[in-house]
Amino acid sequence: MDQLNVKEQQEFQQIVEQKQMKDFMNLYSNLVSRCFDDCVNDFTSNSLTSKETSCIAKCSEKFLKHSERVGQRFQEQNALLMQQGPK
């Protein structure tokens, strides 16, 4: 990053932010799709049943915790690779 001029740093930052937003939207989309498919079964009403609401809450919590754990493992592996240096 230090080798980039100010304009290049700004462009790089914008690319990183766009990538982060895309990743967040993919995570959100996957969460909605998975939890809806697993939890919503009754289409006779325009509102969720208490069972469906509870299922969605548990499903989304589990999904987000799993995603957080995966992210932590990637960070740990990246730190380990950085310590080892180039091969």
From Swiss-Prot:
Main subcellular location of this protein, as a coarse class: mitochondrion
Give a single Pfam family match. Answer: zf-Tim10_DDP
Q: Which pairs of Cys residues are joined through disulfide bonds in the record?
A: 35-59, 39-55
Notes on the domains: The twin CX3C motif contains 4 conserved Cys residues that form 2 disulfide bonds in the mitochondrial intermembrane space. However, during the transit of TIM9 from cytoplasm into mitochondrion, the Cys residues probably coordinate zinc, thereby preventing folding and allowing its transfer across mitochondrial outer membrane.
Q: Can you tell which superkingdom this protein's organism belongs to? A: Eukaryota
Q: Which residues form a coiled coil?
A: none
Source gene? TIM9
**GO cellular component terms attached to this protein's record:** mitochondrial intermembrane space protein transporter complex; TIM22 mitochondrial import inner membrane insertion complex
Instruction: Report motif location: Twin CX3C motif.
Output: 35-59
User: Its membrane topology, per UniProt?
Assistant: Peripheral membrane protein
Q: Where in the cell is it found?
A: Mitochondrion inner membrane
Q: How does it assemble?
A: Heterohexamer; composed of 3 copies of TIM9 and 3 copies of TIM10, named soluble 70 kDa complex. Associates with the TIM22 complex, whose core is composed of TIM22 and TIM54. Interacts with the transmembrane regions of multi-pass transmembrane proteins in transit.
Give the record's GO biological process terms: protein insertion into mitochondrial inner membrane
**Keyword annotations of the record:** Chaperone, Disulfide bond, Membrane, Metal-binding, Mitochondrion, Mitochondrion inner membrane, Protein transport, Translocation, Transport, Zinc
Tell me which species this is from. Candida albicans (strain SC5314 / ATCC MYA-2876)
Q: What role does it play?
A: Mitochondrial intermembrane chaperone that participates in the import and insertion of multi-pass transmembrane proteins into the mitochondrial inner membrane. Also required for the transfer of beta-barrel precursors from the TOM complex to the sorting and assembly machinery (SAM complex) of the outer membrane. Acts as a chaperone-like protein that protects the hydrophobic precursors from aggregation and guide them through the mitochondrial intermembrane space.
Family of this protein = Belongs to the small Tim family.
Q: Name one GO molecular function term.
A: unfolded protein binding
| Protein's recorded name | Mitochondrial import inner membrane translocase subunit TIM9
